[in-house]
């Protein structure tokens, strides 16, 4: 059975970079990223490995909602300048890169789902809780920095909803980190309570007459924003990747990195 280790490139590298005392010390970054990748290979013993990078194009989410991820700090200039050299170094270690046109998350999600559907195992290396929506027994998420798999039970307890309700929660309460709006006046706690009662968005919106007038009004007025927020939070899992799995075998010969259109 194939075991595909899929690394969220900037999620890993930016956290490692943030821990380096001298922001211009790209040699230390290279050493630490190399060490991290070596450890990932040693811990997981994958048959295949890829590291997926965000691209420079404006994402379809940003086009749909211009405030998406608004206000995020840009990549530090030394890291931006040294990133290509780091990617080339990883290629010499037979860790193949995939370059997304815009956001890496959709490419990672597509890779993971395709692997799982082909009866393989996908391990996503990332701390991004958004991947928890990929609810499949052959898809897991590894937190390299805490050296543990994502604890779904703990996440569900923290969010107050089941994993299967993650997108409905984002639709109602939004996500401040990504500037996904949700419905004005509906916070995470009240959203979780509503989903505990009604289970799904569709059931909730068809049950507005059963709610108090004030809350029903908020939900009715925010219905379209909830739909937008759901779409922004939902990962694409069916991108045309046009890649050959054999090019990503662990310890295989380096090859040109593909660019994925989105």
Curated annotation (Swiss-Prot):
BP terms from Gene Ontology: DNA replication, Okazaki fragment processing
Cysteines engaged in disulfide bonds, as pairs: none
UniProt binding sites for Mg(2+): 105
Record text on cofactor binding: Binds 2 Mg(2+) per subunit. Only one magnesium ion has a direct interaction with the protein, the other interactions are indirect.
One Pfam family linked to the record: 5_3_exonuc
Positions of region (Interaction with DNA): 185-190
Entry's Gene Ontology molecular function annotations: 5'-3' exonuclease activity; 5'-flap endonuclease activity; DNA binding; magnesium ion binding; potassium ion binding
Entry superkingdom: Bacteria
Cofactor(s) needed by this chain: Mg(2+); K(+)
Coiled-coil intervals, chain numbering: none
Domain 5'-3' exonuclease, residue spans: 164-251
Residue ranges of the TM segments: none
Family: Belongs to the Xni family.
PANTHER family: 5'-3' EXONUCLEASE FAMILY PROTEIN, FLAP ENDONUCLEASE XNI
Descriptive protein name: Flap endonuclease Xni
Organism from which the protein derives: Shewanella sp. (strain W3-18-1)
